[in-house]
Amino acid sequence: MRKKIVAGNWKMNTLPAEGVELAKEVAAGRKDVCDAVTMIVCPPFTHLYSVIETLKGANIAVGAQDCATEVKGAYTGEVSAEMIAALGCEYVILGHSERRQYYGETSETLNKKMARAYENNLKPIYCVGENLEEREAGRHFEVCKQQIEEVVFNLTEEQFESLVIAYEPVWAIGTGKTATAEQAEEIHAYIREVLRSKFGAKAEECPILYGGSCKPSNAGEIFSKENVDGGLIGGAALKAEDFLGIGKAF
């Protein structure tokens, strides 16, 4: 049985006090979401610690939104995987489309970040997906396959066991557009097929999250698909009621 996951990516939103308040609201409603669903929140670096402290004992994991390629040293402004892990983070988002688009992250960069994450026992949530131009050109399978082969295929079988994949239809993020449940299932099934070609039966255990515009009103339909194991949630994660509503959609 694959793990069911709802992960909230807060992006560059909330000030520390607001983040703590949001975490408290999510914690208060956690009891209404099935225990079998793994709930994760990923706040900005500035309030990772306070959110982790707030959520102690709440059965909600905390992740970071990124980590540095390097271990430590003269890298002004960077935050290392070791620092994140020392705070008590369990997960780290890597390869988000916004990092690829705005900060030029490449497979080379992401292989380094992936290595740092595993060195510090962080579980990566690795993002793949195509933009509108690539989708309209019919290249969505090709793009996702390349992003997996160039990074995920470098993992050992043991490392792969703790990996989470998030499929982001980049054309559906922040645009209000949503891939249909059928479109989501089609590409999730393909991603699992690609993983199977390298990792065999272990691919059946890898959670693949949908990272488009997911909300309580459409989550149930999307999550009902065989190869959709949850969601990497953006905007809806900033409202506790919506985030919890998505968690109840299984």
Regions found by a protein language model. Give the residues of each.
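Active-site loop-to-helix "anion-binding N-cap" substructures in soluble metabolic enzymes
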Residues: 1-250
